[in-house]
Amino acid sequence: MLLPKRVKYRRQHRPKTTGRSKGGNYVTFGEYGLQATTTSWITSRQIESARIAMTRYMKRGGKVWIKIFPHTPYTKKPLEVRMGAGKGAVEGWIAVVKPGRILFEVAGVSEEVAREALRLASHKLPVKTKFVKREELGGETNES
């Protein structure tokens, strides 16, 4: 499971979940990607579950990049505890995902295999997603 090695502060305020993603909106490493179309928190367990689903379907062929990381801690107080007495203990780690963010990238497999692997991964996540291909910058190449 993914979690930071060390953090400056153990507990944080809850992050904003409005607007579109500022960065990470393009497929940069692989050939195909899984792009979020809605906003949600994704836990480190959900990321790991999606990764396992993809790699098992691809039978360890190709390469998978995880483009999100759960930096943000979320806290929870125990059941049946009255309000007050400080903030609760850290329950887990989340990545805030906004529309437009690329979650996973895949390379080294055919488009059909990549599409199905990313579809299986999307079923493990709490966001709506779409399959995207890499867009080359600059348009045509000048080879004469």
From Swiss-Prot:
It holds the Pfam family Ribosomal_L16. It comes from the Bacteria. One of its GO terms (cellular component) is cytosolic large ribosomal subunit. InterPro entries: Ribosomal_uL16, Ribosomal_uL16_bact-type, Ribosomal_uL16_CS, Ribosomal_uL16_dom, Ribosomal_uL16_sf. One of its GO terms (molecular function) is rRNA binding. Coiled coil: none annotated. The keyword Glycoprotein does not apply. Residues 1-23 are annotated as: Disordered. Residues 1-19 have a biased composition (Basic residues). Gene3D superfamilies: Ribosomal protein L10e/L16. CDD domains: Ribosomal_L16_L10e. Keywords: Ribonucleoprotein, Ribosomal protein, RNA-binding, rRNA-binding, tRNA-binding. The keyword rRNA-binding applies. One of its GO terms (biological process) is translation. SUPFAM superfamilies: Ribosomal protein L16p/L10e. Binds 23S rRNA and is also seen to make contacts with the A and possibly P site tRNAs. Part of the 50S ribosomal subunit. Belongs to the universal ribosomal protein uL16 family. This is Large ribosomal subunit protein uL16. It comes from Staphylococcus haemolyticus (strain JCSC1435). The gene is rplP.
